[in-house]
Amino acid sequence: MTNKPGFFLGPTLFDDVSPEMSIYQEEIFGPVLVVLRVKDFNAAIRLANEHQFGNGVAIFTNQGSKAREFIHSVEVGMVGINVAIPVPLSFYTFGGWKDSIFG
């Protein structure tokens, strides 16, 4: 914590988020995870690609072929497979696409 003006939110999970919510529309950095549920694989790709920011996205699947297809189909800088947050290792770049602050 700090005594400087501003806002602080501890580690938080926002579940059942929809694209209409501001938590989805804004680019948030910190210990925050936003979870959207989609009907099918193509909807997941479409949702990621239609967003104005392209920093990172994650998908949970037990199908390696779908994981590879997802990686090559989404327009983001970082993709996580079966991890909550796509955090790069020290030898990978950290960056996004589109209007992402780090893009």
Give names to the regions the model predicted.
Residues 4, 8-103:
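Conserved C-terminal structural/oligomerization subdomain of aldehyde/semialdehyde dehydrogenase
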